């Protein structure tokens, strides 16, 4: 086999459909568009979601919720994440280097999920009441 001899399998390629080229082709005159109406005209078609004048689905359904603009800057870390983290002093840059929070995170909070048995000192990071109690019970502190 050589590159200049490769061909598609027979029947795999179809000739382009030529419309409006006489009645013998089966697609002459109206070219498969039917008779009259908006869809038969040049440049004539409805917008996406148009339901013939009926109130469209995207307007019939109620709006719900909103997209928080601060969400991308806020992050949370669990006690289990702190347990596997090698550092004893934890701040936002440390968490970013470890890949526990995103690069754009500005505010980080520790939540009580999982167990913590080692001493951890938090600097510039908030903690929920339960997480703070667990950190202090393990000998750590929240600054």
Swiss-Prot record:
UniProt-listed InterPro entries: Ribosomal_uL15, Ribosomal_uL15/eL18, Ribosomal_uL15/eL18_sf, Ribosomal_uL15_bac-type
The protein's assembly and partners: Part of the 50S ribosomal subunit.
One GO cellular component, as annotated: cytosolic large ribosomal subunit
Keywords: Ribonucleoprotein, Ribosomal protein, RNA-binding, rRNA-binding
Source species, domain of life: Bacteria
Pfam families registered for this protein in UniProt: Ribosomal_L27A
Coiled coil: none
HAMAP family hit by this protein: Ribosomal_uL15
Species of provenance: Methylibium petroleiphilum (strain ATCC BAA-1232 / LMG 22953 / PM1)
Ribosomal protein keyword on record: yes
Any GO MF annotation of the entry: rRNA binding
Name listed for the protein in its UniProt record: Large ribosomal subunit protein uL15
Gly residues composition bias: residue spans: 21-31
GO BP, one annotated term: translation
Name of the encoding gene: rplO
NCBIfam families noted in UniProt: rplO_bact (TIGR01071)
Annotated spans, Disordered: 1-51
Family: Belongs to the universal ribosomal protein uL15 family.
